[in-house]
Amino acid sequence: MEERYSEYGDIFRTNSNSLFPFIYFCNPKAIQQIFTADPDTFTSGGTNGILQYYVGRNSLLLQDGDRHKRQKKLLMPPFHGDRMRKYGDLIYNITSNVISHWKIEQPFPIRKLTQEISLKVILRAVFGLDQQGKSYEKLRVLMSDLLDSMSSPLSSTFLFFNFLRKDWGPWSPWGRFLRKKQELHELIIAEIQTAKKEGNHRDDILSLLLEARDEAGNAMSDEEIKDELLTMLFAGHETTASALAWALYWIDMIPSVGEKLMAELATIPSNSDQVAITKLPYLSAICQETLRIYPIAMNAFPRVVQKPIEIMGYQLEPGMVAIVPIYLTHHREDIYPEPKKFKPERFLERQFSPYEYLPFGGGSRRCIGSAFALFEMKLVLATILSQWELKLLPNQRISPVRRGLTMAPPANMRMVVKPKKSWQKVSQPILTSG
């Protein structure tokens, strides 16, 4: 896509396998028009049809119109307000527990570490599951297996071609996928039933969804809740893990970045809580720059034109597909000078509009878990780096690989744990209670 952008500029088209062309808009003015257009101008849920095999047909990602509005309102409360403080305790405790088992000078794959942390956080936050329980271990294994099935173009080929989606038994790729998915669905339905029996004694996201009511006073069905929980698991685990791994990579790769971050962490008063940690300017800038240079997804969700609209002089007709390329927008030289360089300072020097910086998409389709994802990133990084120093092993060739929908670091990217000198340590940077 970078070649097409270099050749054709802000607006270019590609011929896809569909009947209508895909039109890419890289200019912030065009992006603003798309994100703020009348809701009836575009639909997006139908273009995500391939995701139904993972998240189910009731997922917010697959909805449009009034149904999308209803689901989004029902799902918003767990990701805002005072809930964040409770998540802070959870994130800190899980991260502290994981890194307490580290061995000095012993190399390890960093992506595996961040996957472990993010999966434990999401399972605890969503289901209230303790890692010692059987349900936790079953969910962990099933999630890992299903994510592996979409981790590369080769392994996920069957999703794109109908003739490959044939169940020839448990040893065939599609048959194995279907059985793993069914196991996961049954396990989640069982957790929903357990949560119903336990009533108000829980504080996880599942319990909040059971209590949620729309404007007519109706609750979500078990199938709707199941599919939304699946969406949270798939959208919130691998994406955060990849972003964390990239952040740790850049912090060590550019020594001045790590030095500035440590200096900032050292200024934290001993009585600070988790929310105060997440407001640190340079820590925030590091997370923002990480998501700029390697965004969670290459493109925002495609939008299918439903009625004629003109975008920067380009006439779109019904059936055409408008795409906002996040990666290309984040690498515009006129917005981000030296876009291939990791420079957190750019986020301290100016504020970017939501049409220039859009790691979580935009408009009505913006990711509802964006605040949670950033909150988790900041707390995990602060917890780790206030106590330990992580160094990349030398002579590694690091380049992004596809992992589901994300641009992840390679699985073999390895780091080593080194103890901090006494003057480098931050004394109790995050409290264990909000």
Give short role names for the model-derived ranges.
Residues 43-52, 67, 83-242, 260, ...:
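Cytochrome P450 heme-thiolate monooxygenase catalytic core
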Residues 70, 230, 235, 274-275, ...:
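Cytochrome P450 heme-thiolate "Cys pocket" and heme-binding signature region
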Residues 5, 95, 99, 141-144, ...:
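Cytochrome P450 proximal C-terminal region
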Residues 324-350, 426, 431:
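Conserved cytochrome P450 K-helix/beta-meander segment immediately N-terminal to the heme-binding cysteine loop
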Residues 169-173, 283-299, 303, 410-434:
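C-terminal domain-closing interface element
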Residues 88-92, 138-146, 200-207, 250-297, ...:
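Cytochrome P450 I-helix active-site segment
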